[in-house]
Swiss-Prot record:
Keyword GTP-binding part of the UniProt annotation: no
Function: Mediates the interaction of DNA replication initiator protein DnaA with DNA polymerase subunit beta sliding clamp (dnaN). Stimulates hydrolysis of ATP-DnaA to ADP-DnaA, rendering DnaA inactive for reinitiation, a process called regulatory inhibition of DnaA or RIDA.
Keyword annotations of the record: DNA replication, DNA replication inhibitor
Pfam families: Bac_DnaA, Hda_lid
Similarity annotation: Belongs to the DnaA family. HdA subfamily.
Keyword Isomerase appears in the UniProt entry: no
Top-level taxon of origin: Bacteria
Assembly behavior: The active form seems to be an ADP-bound monomer. Forms the RIDA complex (regulatory inactivation of DnaA) of ATP-DnaA, ADP-Hda and the DNA-loaded beta sliding clamp (dnaN).
Organism: Yersinia enterocolitica serotype O:8 / biotype 1B (strain NCTC 13174 / 8081)
Entries under HAMAP family matching the protein: Hda
InterPro entries recorded: Chromosome_initiator_DnaA-like (IPR020591), DnaA_dom (IPR013317), Hda (IPR017788), Hda_Enterobact (IPR022864), Hda_lid (IPR055199), P-loop_NTPase (IPR027417)
Protein name as annotated: DnaA regulatory inactivator Hda
Chain's gene name: hda
Biological process according to GO: DNA replication initiation; negative regulation of DNA-templated DNA replication initiation
Length: 239
């Protein structure tokens, strides 16, 4: 999925970001987060501005939900922006200029700008412009609650603490298995329960790692024309 983020530069360039097209609301397994999922979906479908901040210590689907929100609106022809602040070395704070004109702005990993005066001020100014226009949906993620971000700009910390704040609860092992089986089903193949539990036992349980491994196994299964079994998985992953 291509999402175009407008850059307010002298050349009026745009920064195209390719987001995973398999990270949608349909492929997100909510676990104990149905309220957060419902809040984001409601915000996306509203015609007026709103603000949601959600956080988790270990990732656990934060980026997935932002990608899903972008996909939902971009498919309707709406202008959206996604800014991964863990990759801010590739762009400048001015990337935020003018984003209040977009239907949706997603800011990922805001903890990464803590202590960076220019980025903090740019984010503070964007927040204020979005509030003034009242049209843009703003979704922000972090690895901790807003008040614990160690930001150098107190007013930004205060702004981020307004609105709806959620903790993204981590999935249990049983929920991770169901999330893997959902992803497999959407890709058109079956992940047997014993194979899924084997993966959870032998691999890093971080969901991004598990999904990447599932993709690898899917490709290997297609190439070898074999179903997913524990012996086949051991062979492919050298376990």
């Amino acid at each position: 999925m291509l999402v175009e983020v407008l850059l307010n530069t002298p050349a009026q360039l745009s920064l195209p970001l390719y987001l995973p097209d398999d990270e949608t609301f349909a492929s997100f397994y909510p676990g104990e987060n149905p309220s957060l999922l419902a809040a984001i979906q409601s915000a996306v479908h509203q015609s007026h501005g709103s603000y949601i901040y959600f956080w988790s210590r270990e990732g656990g689907g934060r980026s997935h939900l932002l990608h899903a929100a972008c996909a939902e609106l971009s498919q309707k022809g709406e202008a959206v922006g996604y800014v991964p602040l863990d990759k801010r070395a590739y762009f400048v704070p001015e990337v935020l200029d003018g984003m209040e004109q977009l239907a949706l702005v997603c800011i990922d990993n805001i903890e990464c700008i803590a202590g960076d005066e220019q980025w903090e001020m740019a984010m503070f100014n964007l927040y204020n412009r979005i509030v003034e226009t009242g049209r843009t949906r703003l979704l922000i993620t972090g690895d901790r609650p807003p008040r614990q971000l160690n930001l150098g700009l107190p007013d930004l910390a205060s702004r981020l603490d307004w609105g709806q704040i959620y903790k993204l609860q981590p999935l249990s092992d049983d929920e991770k298995l169901q999330a893997l089986q959902l992803r497999a089903k959407l890709r058109g193949f079956e992940l047997p329960e014993d194979v899924g539990r084997f993966l959870l036992k032998r691999l890093d349980r971080e969901m991004r790692t598990l999904f990447m491994t599932l993709d690898q196994l899917d490709r290997a299964s297609i190439t070898a024309q074999r179903k997913l079994t524990i012996p086949f998985v051991k062979e492919i992953l050298s376990l």
